[in-house]
Amino acid sequence: FIMMKSLIITLLCSFCLSTTNAQSYFRQCGIQLLTKQNGLSNNTLTGIYQDKAGFLWLGTDVGLSRYDGIHFHNYNLIDKEPRALTHLYETSNNLLWSHIANLNQIACFDKMRGIYMPLISPTPEVLQDIQDICVLQDKLYALTSNAIVELNMEKNADEIRLTAQPLID
């Protein structure tokens, strides 16, 4: 037991020293570490995207964070259940799309209004089984467990209607 305790203490001390050395090295190289202490919503990043205006959009497990080079503005998801927002993409209508990896769903954020948009579909089962997403030439594509689909968007004031058109079954 004493050997195990000594090993754990040694590993913890080594980790703390290496973290301190890493932070010092980053500062010397002009690299700024950004964390919750700087305003980031969560230290766990699951996606990153830079938009045309230069803002960095960071996916975390509590929502999106927008970084302007100085400040963070956080857009937390409504429910408090952890979600990994990955694969961030933007379409020309200022919508930021993200895959919610741990739920196999997608999220849509309206950058102009600063809100998450509800997604409505006549085939909701398609929206419950998304493995990955991609935006190509302003079109949203999704990979499900048994098909590749193009998701056609119709944006209303309060919601986005999605219809799925299978490309490959």
Where are these regions (language model features)?
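Carboxylate-rich, polar loop motifs that coordinate divalent cations or form catalytic acidic clusters
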Residues: 2-169
